[in-house]
Design a protein with these regions (language model features):
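Alpha-helical transmembrane segments of multi-pass small-molecule/ion transporters
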Residues: 1-315
């Protein structure tokens, strides 16, 4: 294993610590990451390019072998998290800008970190990759449509413009990554070795930019937003697990869909908020806090399931 690979793996495994550190720096020195703001869409594009670079045709085999599990996962992703976000916003009577931010992250597809957490939890990694990939590829259509339906009454939303943003920031970079992988083949291995490092660097810069731009609102409403994020994430895990259980999927798929549903592509949420709600930077805060929290909670949940699996294997 190369030094770059070792460093990259270490950074990837300690992501939550780096996210919390950069959020703290941005809070106490908000101008530190001010320069990052205009580059948020590009940073997300780099992350999505990395996702495309690692995808293989075999990653979609499960879509044909076990379509039921993938379909249930994708439906659960785009039903549970948006609905939960909307209900939390209404039940807690959240201010419009915060409510829109919570709903926005709820309407995003699953996050790529869910694949790692599924592996650690001894879930079905192939299913995790397929659900993440499919939900991401159809997000240009579903994310703006569901977001408009649930949050259109709260703030003015340009769904068509948002669709184009997702195509540019998500779909195009993924397709480009697939093409590069197809053309270069094994030569992309050195690039993929650095992906955890590059992805973590990109997302912590996005977090820093969002937190720095919203310091005032975080002081005013940070505890409320964090509480909603924790509830949103936790309910996602719970309902994702039972969605798989109630539809007769095996235990490894139940763990997988719990993680898939509960963990969001919060980087996309932050990028969309920065691009379409620049006048209300607090809209991006739920996504930024989600980025920090879901990696902590996902690690804890994966560790619990891994320990449980090890215990059951002992004679």
């Amino acid at each position: 294993m190369s030094i770059l690979n070792k460093i990259s793996n270490f950074i990837g495994k300690t992501f939550s610590l780096w996210a919390a550190l950069f959020a703290g720096i941005a809070f106490f020195a908000p101008d530190t990451f001010k320069w990052v703001g205009p580059y948020i869409p590009w940073l997300l594009g780099i992350i999505m390019f990395g996702m495309g670079l690692t995808l293989k045709p075999s990653d979609f085999d499960i879509l044909f072998k076990r379509p039921k599990a993938v379909i249930i996962g994708v439906i659960a992703q785009f039903a549970i998290m948006p609905a939960t976000a909307y209900l939390l916003a209404k039940l807690l009577n959240l201010p419009a800008e915060i409510a829109v931010g919570v709903i926005l992250v709820g309407c995003c597809p699953g996050g790529t970190a869910s694949n790692v957490m599924t592996y650690l939890a001894r879930g079905n990694v192939a299913l995790s990759v397929a659900v993440t990939s499919v939900s991401t590829l159809i997000s240009p259509l579903l994310t703006p449509a569901i977001f408009l339906m649930l949050a259109g009454e709260m703030l003015e939303i340009q769904a068509g413009s948002m669709l184009m943003s997702i195509v540019k920031m998500v779909l195009f970079p993924i397709v480009l990554g697939l093409i590069v992988h197809k053309v270069l083949g094994n030569k992309t291995e050195k690039l993929t070795d650095a992906l955890p490092l590059v992805s973590v660097a990109a997302i912590v810069l996005i977090i820093g930019a969002v937190v720095g731009a919203s310091k005032g609102k975080i002081i005013e409403s940070g505890l409320l937003i964090f509480t909603v994020v924790v509830l949103h994430n936790g309910i996602g895990y719970l309902l994702g697990f039972f969605a798989a259980k109630w539809t007769g999927l095996p235990y490894d798929a139940q763990k997988t869909l719990a993680i898939e549903v509960g963990m969001q592509n919060s980087g996309l949420g932050a990028a969309l908020a920065a691009a379409h709600f620049a006048a209300a930077p607090v809209v991006a805060v739920p996504s930024a806090l989600f980025s920090v929290w879901h990696n902590i909670s996902g690690s804890l949940l994966a560790t619990y399931w891994a320990a449980k699996a090890s215990k059951h294997k002992k004679p």
